[in-house]
Amino acid sequence: MGLPLMMERSSNNNNVELSRVAVSDTHGEDSPYFAGWKAYDENPYDESHNPSGVIQMGLAENQVSFDLLETYLEKKNPEGSMWGSKGAPGFRENALFQDYHGLKTFRQAMASFMEQIRGGKARFDPDRIVLTAGATAANELLTFILADPNDALLVPTPYYPGFDRDLRWRTGVKIVPIHCDSSNHFQITPEALESAYQTARDANIRVRGVLITNPSNPLGATVQKKVLEDLLDFCVRKNIHLVSDEIYSGSVFHASEFTSVAEIVENIDDVSVKERVHIVYSLSKDLGLPGFRVGTIYSYNDNVVRTARRMSSFTLVSSQTQHMLASMLSDEEFTEKYIRINRERLRRRYDTIVEGLKKAGIECLKGNAGLFCWMNLGFLLEKKTKDGELQLWDVILKELNLNISPGSSCHCSEVGWFRVCFANMSENTLEIALKRIHEFMDRRRRF
């Protein structure tokens, strides 16, 4: 069935029609989150050529361990590994059609890597892995499978601004926020869950699931095991799904501080409970490979796996990419070294920015994971409102030339919080960013 058509607003009545999806404003790209990216693109910082330019601190990209990947590829001769087998047979193997849901060798390697990240505390069946072109595609595909247009997913705030696009735009599904606050470090409570569910019911919106990020983006903190258990109990009582986006699971500074929902499921025998749980993963954050566009859906539900395989034809990963990464992820000596060093480098980088901000008189939420910190500038707001927050964000963007993400773009229930990324730049660039913040705070104190 085709999409219903409507006229695009224009003074020209003869304009050709576009679909409702095309002219919808649910793409989310009018958010300050994306406006900051545009400001960076127009005036990017460069240490030599544009030292006064905008420093991009709104992009959660992991560049701190790229040297490890480059060294591995140089030593392992990627020409052979990326083609599977060498020469003409390898080329033929890549050039012809493959299983839409992913090459078996790569799914096996991905399953092993996901187990390794979790310290062997959860097992993953390669036959339950469906490959997608990144986590963005995985989350959207799952939303298509779990919900109908005008249904809703409950999502705890603050949440990743891109979810407004990924979960809503093409699917027609709504996001109903689970409002969390700083009184308990923004952890999800049973009361907040029930309140969000009731809000949806009062609006005659059918709730189809809860979607969380663990570790949280933008908080940079893991979800506690008890909270995960409460979430699953809630989903069972309401007969809805639980989606856990775990794309930062390998970026927890200390592995023991992370509990995957897979560990909870591991100890459950009841199939009717297990089959409502779905995990999203990607190599974009932990391995720092967003350009490779590799994401996965892992579901304990046979029907979801079956449908995701069918839908994955719209979001394939190239065979060449799969062959190369299968070779890399199957090298356990390399992956163990990479995970260990990457965790330590991220922890040191986090400590650098948090201590630097503290010296400037700025506090952050205590974090233990991810590529960002959650910074509290509420004390600088002239007005304790969303407009007041955006005014401060505008000053930071235009006067300090720093692009950070305001909490309102993450639907935070409290004003004055900002997400600040630290892993997509050199240590020297981070020091320059901190210097700009220190100078800004000094000026504020004088006036």
Swiss-Prot record:
Coiled coil: none annotated. Expressed in roots. Substrate binds at E61, Y100. Optimum pH is 8. Its EC number is 4.4.1.14. CDD domains: AAT_like. Keywords: Ethylene biosynthesis, Fruit ripening, Lyase, Pyridoxal phosphate, S-adenosyl-L-methionine, Ubl conjugation. Ubiquitinated by XBAT32. Ubiquitination probably leads to its subsequent degradation, thus controlling ethylene production. The keyword Zinc does not apply. Pfam families: Aminotran_1_2. Induction: By cycloheximide (CHX). Its cofactor is pyridoxal 5'-phosphate. One of its GO terms (molecular function) is identical protein binding. Belongs to the class-I pyridoxal-phosphate-dependent aminotransferase family. Homodimer and heterodimer. In vivo, the relevance of heterodimerization with other ACS enzymes is however unsure. Interacts with XBAT32. 1-aminocyclopropane-1-carboxylate synthase (ACS) enzymes catalyze the conversion of S-adenosyl-L-methionine (SAM) into 1-aminocyclopropane-1-carboxylate (ACC), a direct precursor of ethylene. This is 1-aminocyclopropane-1-carboxylate synthase 7. The lineage of its organism: Eukaryota, Viridiplantae, Streptophyta, Embryophyta, Tracheophyta.
